[in-house]
Amino acid sequence: MSNRSLSLAAMRGRVARALAGLAMAITLHAAPARAAESCAVTLATPTHLEPAENVGDYRDVLRLCRGDGGGAVAIRTLTLSGQEVLLLADPEKLTTRLESAACWTCEDVEESRIAGTRLMRAVEKSAEAPGLERRGFLQNAGLVHGRAPGSYFTGDLCPSSKPMDRAFLSRLPTERPPTPIALSISGLWLKHHFDDYRWLLDRQADGAFVITWTNHSYHHQFKRGVPFDRNFMNSPGVDPDREILDTEQLLIANGQTPSLFFRFPGLISSAPLMQAAREKHLISLGADAWLADGGKPKPGSIILVHPNGNEPVGLKMFDRDLASGLIAEPFEPLTKAPN
């Protein structure tokens, strides 16, 4: 074969691969409208705390799925009442949903198959943002600021012996209902504050706000006075995989869908912990405006308060800053924050 023939063959091969990649991207990014309508799994609103065991065989995966008219990325598989279910992520909108696995044809893939999607860009960028590098730990690593002009409201629900501040959450702006908020939920908070959790679901059903459920670990380990390199999830014996997956499993058992975001307790992590979140295809979430910790809000800020009863001063600062115009409005869904 001549050199010219070889060159033409090589060029045809490159073009074919490029077209195949483009076709895959188009399929992946297309909205699976008909599949979403007929295959969505509707979770019942619980009347009491449901055990995590109601969700069976919960596993993290990475699968490229194709259904009736579109595609999606599966990051978890599970069973509900014997039915196989997928936790699907929209690789561009960064939203999640639960759908019947029977509606999809899926294959296990390497990350290279979804490289270039907004999902992988956000996961990788947050994992590579070290925040403040301290001796033995990282502080406020991950995504800390979003796209302006609005703000991103995030409230942490760490384990607490106090009731959630319902009055504060009821005061959130409602000029453009439902107000998008992100709540970082820990497994132990949900187990011990079901009435407050149910109140949140009722408010959401009433249209007051729409909640993005951020994973805040299951146990949220903390010992006062212990150095941060051996505290929070850096505590000896912590299994980050279980902290992540057990929280998601309990949340699904109690009627809600986990998001793609994970916030480390105390905003304290480490390089191995950041990698653990990344391997679960989660976006590590920090904050550039933890109000009670001295953060100053500005357009695009990810604002952090604790409506769990543990940090009333932060709630007062939020009310003050919102009234004075220091907190930029409108509030935006957290899914809009990553570039």
Language-model features, listed with the residues they occupy:
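Terminal accessory/targeting
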Residues: 1-154, 164-166, 170-182, 188-195, ...
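Active-site groove signature of glycoside hydrolases
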Residues: 140, 144, 148-159, 214, ...
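Metal-dependent polysaccharide deacetylase catalytic core of the NodB/CE4 family, i.e.
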Residues: 162, 175-275, 279-303
